[in-house]
């Protein structure tokens, strides 16, 4: 964490930023090692960083934080600390009202966004971060296999989701990384078809998309199955998505752009005549947030680098018929890509 702070301070020097105010919880955790439930804020002044927390969070923050911790009773104390700051570095997510309050109550003259330097830091994972994500992926692998076993004719989607979310917690997850998607039948054509009260029927395609939050880091995996035997159309679109996903994983490597990686899977799906049914980007970064940089899309020119963790998740979604998505969390390595989620992909 010392190295992270040093890079932030260097950015401040290069951009004539006097102080930095960090409020987004995942960024507070990234720089301090703690994420107070009741709120916490980091102020960087010169090369010194301090974590400010409400009184009720003080004892826990003191135990966990790698930064000095100071408690406050009223936010006015924060305004006072930042009084007469010429240039304040802030995150783009900071609310308009808080910016206005800093102008009025702290007399801040100018604001500069610090999102780019934080993105550049967080986009490359350390060895320790990768090990945590690998554990989160291990939990997700166990959960997706349990979901496959749980899915039977007549069972409600929510029943399956509840059981796998319980299993993830029993295996060490803090909670699901996001609302578990169990989307069956016509609902499998909904990319974000979170589990509903719909009963699963024989012949349904079922998209299972889940992830585990473990020690603050996320995992993400999707598998698609059929209840019973697949028909010709279901098998066709499954094989196309599987080919696109495998080819993209095999091709991913440092030096290529996110756009180039997206196009590998997208062109395969287009060649089979289903380009209009692949309606989202190929993937996204995974880390402290379930969706973070880079965006693996047809518009993103980000160059892939060793240490990035991304998802590769092509899909085909045909309204009224159903959909197929196959997704893995993948680590970009020196020589290519390594699947961190390892559940069998050939499930039809």
From Swiss-Prot:
Its EC number is 3.4.13.9. It catalyses: Xaa-L-Pro dipeptide + H2O = an L-alpha-amino acid + L-proline. It is found in: Cytoplasm. Belongs to the peptidase M24B family. Archaeal-type prolidase subfamily. GO terms for molecular function: metal ion binding; metallopeptidase activity; proline dipeptidase activity. PANTHER family: AMINOPEPTIDASE (PTHR46112), XAA-PRO AMINOPEPTIDASE P-RELATED (PTHR46112:SF2). It comes from Pyrococcus furiosus (strain ATCC 43587 / DSM 3638 / JCM 8422 / Vc1). This is Xaa-Pro dipeptidase. Optimum pH is 7.0. Co(2+) 1 binds at residues 220, 284, 313, 327. Changing residue 327 to L: Loss of activity. One of its GO terms (cellular component) is cytoplasm. Transmembrane segments: none annotated. Optimum temperature is 100 degrees Celsius. Highly thermostable. Co(2+) 2 binds at residues 209, 220, 327. One of its GO terms (biological process) is proteolysis.
């Amino acid at each position: 964490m010392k190295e992270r702070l040093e890079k932030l301070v260097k950015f401040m020097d290069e951009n004539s930023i006097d102080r930095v105010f960090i409020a987004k919880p995942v960024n507070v955790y990234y720089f301090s090692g703690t994420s107070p439930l009741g709120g916490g804020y980091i102020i960087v002044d010169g090369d010194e960083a301090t974590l400010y927390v409400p009184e009720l969070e003080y004892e826990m923050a003191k135990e966990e934080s790698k930064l000095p911790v100071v408690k406050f009773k009223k936010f006015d104390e924060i305004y006072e600390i930042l009084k007469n700051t010429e240039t304040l570095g802030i995150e783009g997510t900071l609310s308009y009202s808080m910016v206005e309050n800093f102008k009025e109550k702290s007399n801040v003259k100018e604001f500069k966004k610090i999102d780019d330097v934080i993105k550049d830091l967080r986009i490359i994972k350390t060895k320790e971060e990768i090990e945590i994500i690998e554990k989160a992926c291990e939990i997700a692998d166990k959960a997706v296999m349990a979901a496959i076993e749980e899915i039977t004719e007549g069972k409600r989607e929510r029943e399956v989701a509840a059981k796998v979310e319980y299993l993830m917690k029993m295996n060490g997850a803090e909670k699901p990384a996001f609302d578990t998607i169990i989307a069956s039948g016509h609902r499998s054509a909904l990319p974000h078809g979170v589990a509903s009260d719909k009963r699963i029927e024989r012949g349904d395609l079922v998209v299972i998309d889940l992830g585990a939050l473990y020690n603050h880091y996320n995992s993400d995996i999707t598998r698609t199955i059929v209840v019973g035997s697949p028909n010709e159309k279901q098998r066709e679109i499954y094989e196309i998505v599987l080919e696109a996903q495998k080819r993209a994983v095999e091709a991913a490597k440092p030096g290529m752009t996110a756009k180039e990686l997206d196009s590998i899977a997208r062109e395969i799906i287009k060649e089979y005549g289903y380009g209009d049914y692949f309606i989202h980007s190929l993937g996204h970064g995974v880390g402290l947030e379930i969706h973070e940089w880079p965006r693996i899309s047809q518009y993103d020119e980000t160059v892939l680098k060793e240490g990035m963790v991304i998802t590769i998740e092509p899909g085909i979604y045909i309204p009224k018929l159903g959909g197929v998505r196959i997704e893995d969390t993948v680590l970009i390595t020196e020589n290519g890509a390594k699947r961190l989620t390892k559940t069998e992909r050939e499930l039809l």
